[in-house]
Amino acid sequence: MKQRLDRIARMSEEQRLNSIHQFWNLPEDAVFSPEVVALVCDMSLSWLQAKRCQGNGIPFVKVGPRKVGYTKRDVLEFLSKNRYLNT
């Protein structure tokens, strides 16, 4: 997990903005890494990982034996369902 946290921390501001821009410009069936989703949603990687384990976060796909990804469609649906008018 530390490697992933370091990966985001090592990204330049330009790389972060490019990742976010790419997310918004690709089709809804595109699959994104947890790092990109964390940047787009302003969430931590540890939050995404915890919610994957608990089963109540953004739906994910296994893209390899040790890799997960998120479709843009699932990310947008999750954000839409979790909108609030007050606290």
Segment roles from a protein language model:
Residues M1-A50, K67, K72-T87:
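Basic Lys/Arg-rich amphipathic helical interaction modules
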Residues P59-V68:
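Short Lys/Arg-enriched helix C-cap and helix-to-coil transition segments
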